[in-house]
Regions:
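K/E-rich alpha-helical interaction surfaces of small helical-bundle regulatory domains
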Residues: 13-32, 51-53, 59, 242-266
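Mobile genetic element proteins and their domesticated derivatives, centered on retroelements
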Residues: 14-15, 25, 45, 61, ...
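Basic, flexible linker segments flanking DNA-binding modules
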Residues: 23-118, 214, 270-277
Length: 280
Protein backbone atom coordinates (compact mmCIF):
# COMPACT_ATOMS: atom_id res chain seq x y z
CA UNK A 1 0.00 0.00 0.00
CA UNK A 2 2.82 2.42 0.93
CA UNK A 3 4.52 1.74 -2.39
CA UNK A 4 1.34 2.62 -4.28
CA UNK A 5 0.91 5.93 -2.41
CA UNK A 6 4.53 7.11 -2.75
CA UNK A 7 3.70 8.90 -6.02
CA UNK A 8 1.29 11.18 -4.14
CA UNK A 9 2.89 11.52 -0.70
CA UNK A 10 6.38 11.61 0.72
CA UNK A 11 7.72 8.43 2.30
CA UNK A 12 8.22 10.20 5.64
CA UNK A 13 4.51 11.15 5.86
CA UNK A 14 3.37 7.64 4.88
CA UNK A 15 5.64 5.97 7.44
CA UNK A 16 4.49 8.38 10.12
CA UNK A 17 0.80 7.68 9.39
CA UNK A 18 1.43 3.93 9.30
CA UNK A 19 3.62 4.17 12.41
CA UNK A 20 6.16 2.02 10.62
CA UNK A 21 9.93 2.44 11.21
CA UNK A 22 11.92 3.26 8.09
CA UNK A 23 14.23 0.27 8.66
CA UNK A 24 11.24 -2.11 8.82
CA UNK A 25 9.82 -0.69 5.59
CA UNK A 26 13.09 -1.20 3.71
CA UNK A 27 13.50 -4.71 5.15
CA UNK A 28 10.10 -5.80 3.81
CA UNK A 29 10.78 -4.07 0.50
CA UNK A 30 14.02 -6.03 0.18
CA UNK A 31 12.23 -9.30 0.98
CA UNK A 32 9.63 -8.63 -1.72
CA UNK A 33 12.34 -8.10 -4.30
CA UNK A 34 14.10 -11.34 -3.41
CA UNK A 35 13.72 -14.12 -5.98
CA UNK A 36 11.66 -17.11 -4.82
CA UNK A 37 14.36 -19.72 -4.17
CA UNK A 38 11.78 -22.48 -4.50
CA UNK A 39 10.46 -21.30 -7.87
CA UNK A 40 11.88 -24.18 -9.94
CA UNK A 41 11.06 -26.71 -7.22
CA UNK A 42 7.45 -25.52 -7.18
CA UNK A 43 7.23 -25.99 -10.94
CA UNK A 44 8.50 -29.57 -10.60
CA UNK A 45 6.10 -30.26 -7.71
CA UNK A 46 3.16 -29.01 -9.80
CA UNK A 47 4.33 -31.10 -12.77
CA UNK A 48 4.72 -34.29 -10.69
CA UNK A 49 1.35 -33.75 -9.01
CA UNK A 50 -0.50 -33.38 -12.32
CA UNK A 51 1.49 -36.09 -14.14
CA UNK A 52 0.19 -38.49 -11.51
CA UNK A 53 -3.35 -37.07 -11.57
CA UNK A 54 -3.28 -35.89 -7.96
CA UNK A 55 -2.40 -39.35 -6.62
CA UNK A 56 0.92 -38.37 -5.03
CA UNK A 57 1.14 -36.89 -1.54
CA UNK A 58 4.13 -34.94 -0.22
CA UNK A 59 6.20 -38.02 0.70
CA UNK A 60 5.95 -39.60 -2.75
CA UNK A 61 6.56 -36.24 -4.42
CA UNK A 62 9.67 -35.81 -2.24
CA UNK A 63 10.93 -39.17 -3.49
CA UNK A 64 10.20 -38.31 -7.12
CA UNK A 65 11.97 -34.95 -6.72
CA UNK A 66 15.06 -36.88 -5.60
CA UNK A 67 14.77 -39.01 -8.71
CA UNK A 68 14.97 -35.71 -10.61
CA UNK A 69 17.99 -34.54 -8.59
CA UNK A 70 16.04 -32.03 -6.52
CA UNK A 71 16.69 -32.58 -2.83
CA UNK A 72 14.19 -31.07 -0.41
CA UNK A 73 13.09 -32.07 3.08
CA UNK A 74 9.65 -33.71 3.05
CA UNK A 75 8.35 -31.02 5.41
CA UNK A 76 9.43 -28.34 2.94
CA UNK A 77 7.62 -30.17 0.14
CA UNK A 78 4.52 -30.46 2.32
CA UNK A 79 4.61 -26.72 3.06
CA UNK A 80 5.08 -25.81 -0.61
CA UNK A 81 2.20 -28.08 -1.63
CA UNK A 82 -0.03 -26.40 0.94
CA UNK A 83 0.90 -22.98 -0.47
CA UNK A 84 0.20 -24.22 -3.99
CA UNK A 85 -3.13 -25.71 -2.95
CA UNK A 86 -2.12 -29.22 -4.05
CA UNK A 87 -4.06 -31.80 -2.04
CA UNK A 88 -3.63 -35.53 -2.58
CA UNK A 89 -7.03 -37.17 -3.06
CA UNK A 90 -8.16 -39.42 -0.23
CA UNK A 91 -9.31 -43.39 -0.34
CA UNK A 92 -16.82 -49.47 -2.65
CA UNK A 93 -18.28 -52.33 -1.22
CA UNK A 94 -15.92 -55.29 -1.09
CA UNK A 95 -16.74 -58.23 -3.31
CA UNK A 96 -17.50 -61.31 -1.20
CA UNK A 97 -16.87 -64.63 -2.93
CA UNK A 98 -17.35 -66.84 0.14
CA UNK A 99 -20.23 -69.28 -0.31
CA UNK A 100 -19.47 -71.67 2.52
CA UNK A 101 -17.25 -74.74 2.37
CA UNK A 102 -17.88 -75.91 -1.17
CA UNK A 103 -14.46 -77.54 -1.52
CA UNK A 104 -11.22 -78.06 0.35
CA UNK A 105 -10.11 -75.30 2.76
CA UNK A 106 -6.33 -74.83 2.84
CA UNK A 107 -4.42 -73.91 6.02
CA UNK A 108 -3.24 -70.35 6.64
CA UNK A 109 0.41 -70.90 5.74
CA UNK A 110 1.07 -67.18 5.23
CA UNK A 111 -0.14 -66.34 8.74
CA UNK A 112 0.19 -62.57 8.13
CA UNK A 113 3.92 -62.85 7.45
CA UNK A 114 3.96 -60.50 4.46
CA UNK A 115 7.76 -60.17 4.29
CA UNK A 116 9.90 -62.09 1.83
CA UNK A 117 13.50 -61.62 0.72
CA UNK A 118 12.99 -62.82 -2.87
CA UNK A 119 10.39 -62.62 -5.65
CA UNK A 120 8.18 -65.63 -6.40
CA UNK A 121 8.11 -66.87 -2.81
CA UNK A 122 4.82 -65.39 -1.59
CA UNK A 123 1.95 -64.33 -3.82
CA UNK A 124 -1.48 -63.09 -2.73
CA UNK A 125 -4.68 -63.01 -4.75
CA UNK A 126 -8.23 -61.71 -4.48
CA UNK A 127 -11.17 -60.39 -6.50
CA UNK A 128 -12.72 -56.93 -6.27
CA UNK A 129 -15.73 -55.41 -8.00
CA UNK A 130 -16.67 -52.05 -9.51
CA UNK A 131 -20.30 -50.95 -9.86
CA UNK A 132 -20.93 -48.20 -12.42
CA UNK A 133 -23.74 -47.35 -14.84
CA UNK A 134 -25.87 -50.16 -13.42
CA UNK A 135 -23.21 -52.68 -14.42
CA UNK A 136 -20.56 -54.62 -12.50
CA UNK A 137 -16.97 -55.32 -13.50
CA UNK A 138 -14.68 -57.74 -11.65
CA UNK A 139 -10.90 -57.63 -11.30
CA UNK A 140 -8.95 -60.71 -10.23
CA UNK A 141 -5.31 -60.02 -9.40
CA UNK A 142 -2.13 -61.61 -8.05
CA UNK A 143 0.51 -59.56 -6.22
CA UNK A 144 4.02 -60.66 -5.30
CA UNK A 145 4.72 -59.67 -1.69
CA UNK A 146 8.39 -58.99 -2.42
CA UNK A 147 7.77 -55.82 -4.46
CA UNK A 148 3.96 -55.55 -4.31
CA UNK A 149 4.09 -55.90 -8.09
CA UNK A 150 1.13 -57.03 -10.14
CA UNK A 151 2.07 -60.49 -11.42
CA UNK A 152 -1.14 -61.21 -13.33
CA UNK A 153 -4.74 -60.07 -13.60
CA UNK A 154 -7.99 -60.65 -15.47
CA UNK A 155 -11.05 -58.43 -15.90
CA UNK A 156 -14.49 -59.98 -16.30
CA UNK A 157 -18.15 -58.98 -16.41
CA UNK A 158 -19.05 -62.02 -14.27
CA UNK A 159 -17.22 -63.63 -11.30
CA UNK A 160 -16.77 -66.98 -13.05
CA UNK A 161 -14.13 -69.64 -12.40
CA UNK A 162 -12.32 -68.94 -15.68
CA UNK A 163 -11.59 -65.40 -14.48
CA UNK A 164 -9.41 -66.87 -11.72
CA UNK A 165 -7.94 -69.82 -13.64
CA UNK A 166 -6.96 -67.64 -16.62
CA UNK A 167 -5.24 -65.23 -14.24
CA UNK A 168 -3.41 -68.17 -12.63
CA UNK A 169 -2.41 -69.57 -16.03
CA UNK A 170 -0.80 -66.25 -16.99
CA UNK A 171 1.04 -66.08 -13.66
CA UNK A 172 2.32 -69.65 -13.92
CA UNK A 173 3.82 -68.86 -17.35
CA UNK A 174 6.39 -66.56 -15.72
CA UNK A 175 7.03 -68.73 -12.64
CA UNK A 176 10.32 -70.68 -12.62
CA UNK A 177 10.21 -74.33 -11.66
CA UNK A 178 10.90 -75.30 -8.04
CA UNK A 179 10.05 -71.82 -6.76
CA UNK A 180 8.71 -73.07 -3.41
CA UNK A 181 5.88 -70.57 -3.79
CA UNK A 182 2.96 -69.93 -1.44
CA UNK A 183 -0.20 -68.49 -3.05
CA UNK A 184 -2.55 -67.00 -0.47
CA UNK A 185 -6.24 -66.13 -0.90
CA UNK A 186 -9.44 -65.89 1.09
CA UNK A 187 -11.88 -68.82 1.25
CA UNK A 188 -13.76 -67.76 -1.89
CA UNK A 189 -15.48 -70.54 -3.80
CA UNK A 190 -13.11 -70.16 -6.75
CA UNK A 191 -10.11 -70.97 -4.57
CA UNK A 192 -11.86 -74.04 -3.14
CA UNK A 193 -12.62 -75.37 -6.62
CA UNK A 194 -10.89 -78.63 -7.63
CA UNK A 195 -9.71 -77.24 -10.96
CA UNK A 196 -7.97 -74.26 -9.33
CA UNK A 197 -6.41 -76.45 -6.63
CA UNK A 198 -5.22 -78.98 -9.21
CA UNK A 199 -3.46 -76.22 -11.16
CA UNK A 200 -1.59 -75.28 -8.00
CA UNK A 201 -0.69 -78.89 -7.26
CA UNK A 202 0.60 -79.52 -10.79
CA UNK A 203 2.95 -76.53 -10.51
CA UNK A 204 4.06 -77.37 -6.97
CA UNK A 205 2.49 -74.22 -5.49
CA UNK A 206 1.46 -74.37 -1.83
CA UNK A 207 -2.06 -73.08 -1.26
CA UNK A 208 -2.77 -70.85 1.74
CA UNK A 209 -6.12 -69.38 2.84
CA UNK A 210 -7.20 -66.66 5.24
CA UNK A 211 -9.34 -67.58 8.19
CA UNK A 212 -13.04 -67.14 7.53
CA UNK A 213 -14.13 -63.49 7.67
CA UNK A 214 -10.64 -62.20 8.49
CA UNK A 215 -9.64 -59.64 5.85
CA UNK A 216 -6.43 -58.72 7.72
CA UNK A 217 -5.02 -62.12 6.77
CA UNK A 218 -4.84 -60.80 3.20
CA UNK A 219 -4.17 -57.15 4.06
CA UNK A 220 -1.65 -56.39 1.31
CA UNK A 221 -3.98 -57.04 -1.61
CA UNK A 222 -6.87 -55.42 0.28
CA UNK A 223 -4.68 -52.32 0.52
CA UNK A 224 -3.83 -52.54 -3.18
CA UNK A 225 -7.52 -52.54 -4.09
CA UNK A 226 -8.04 -49.57 -1.77
CA UNK A 227 -5.28 -47.62 -3.51
CA UNK A 228 -6.67 -48.53 -6.92
CA UNK A 229 -10.14 -47.27 -6.06
CA UNK A 230 -8.93 -44.09 -4.37
CA UNK A 231 -6.58 -43.19 -7.22
CA UNK A 232 -8.78 -44.23 -10.13
CA UNK A 233 -12.44 -44.80 -9.29
CA UNK A 234 -12.84 -41.80 -6.98
CA UNK A 235 -10.64 -39.39 -8.96
CA UNK A 236 -12.06 -39.56 -12.47
CA UNK A 237 -15.36 -39.34 -14.25
CA UNK A 238 -16.21 -42.04 -16.76
CA UNK A 239 -18.48 -41.95 -19.79
CA UNK A 240 -19.32 -45.65 -19.83
CA UNK A 241 -18.26 -48.98 -18.35
CA UNK A 242 -16.10 -49.56 -21.43
CA UNK A 243 -14.36 -46.23 -20.79
CA UNK A 244 -13.78 -47.24 -17.16
CA UNK A 245 -12.33 -50.58 -18.28
CA UNK A 246 -9.85 -48.81 -20.57
CA UNK A 247 -8.81 -46.50 -17.73
CA UNK A 248 -8.50 -49.48 -15.36
CA UNK A 249 -6.08 -51.23 -17.70
CA UNK A 250 -4.10 -47.99 -18.04
CA UNK A 251 -3.99 -47.56 -14.25
CA UNK A 252 -2.75 -51.11 -13.67
CA UNK A 253 0.12 -50.43 -16.08
CA UNK A 254 0.80 -47.13 -14.31
CA UNK A 255 0.79 -48.83 -10.88
CA UNK A 256 3.25 -51.50 -11.93
CA UNK A 257 5.64 -49.51 -14.09
CA UNK A 258 5.54 -45.85 -13.07
CA UNK A 259 4.01 -45.37 -9.60
CA UNK A 260 6.94 -45.17 -7.19
CA UNK A 261 6.84 -46.61 -3.67
CA UNK A 262 8.91 -45.26 -0.77
CA UNK A 263 9.56 -48.74 0.67
CA UNK A 264 11.02 -49.79 -2.70
CA UNK A 265 13.61 -46.98 -2.54
CA UNK A 266 11.58 -44.76 -4.84
CA UNK A 267 11.17 -47.38 -7.56
CA UNK A 268 7.98 -48.67 -9.21
CA UNK A 269 7.09 -52.29 -8.30
CA UNK A 270 7.94 -53.87 -11.67
CA UNK A 271 11.36 -52.18 -11.81
CA UNK A 272 12.14 -53.25 -8.24
CA UNK A 273 11.11 -56.82 -9.10
CA UNK A 274 13.29 -56.88 -12.20
CA UNK A 275 16.31 -55.63 -10.28
CA UNK A 276 15.81 -58.33 -7.64
CA UNK A 277 15.51 -61.05 -10.30
CA UNK A 278 18.63 -59.78 -12.08
CA UNK A 279 20.61 -59.79 -8.83
CA UNK A 280 19.58 -63.36 -7.96
Amino acid sequence: MIQKLRKEFSLAILLDVAQLPRATFYYHLKQLKKADKYHSAKEEIIAIFHENKGRYGYRRITAELRNRNIYLNHKTVQRLMQKLGLVCRARMKKYRSYKGEVGKIAPNLLNRDFHTEKPNKKWVTDVTEFKLFGETLYLSAILDLHSSDLVSYTISERPVLSMVTTMLDKAIEILPNNSDLILHSDQGWQYQHRRYQRMLWEKGIQQSMSRKGNCLDNAVIENFFGILKSELLYLQEFQSMEHFKQELVAYLDYYNNRRIKAKLKGLPPAIHRQQALSAA
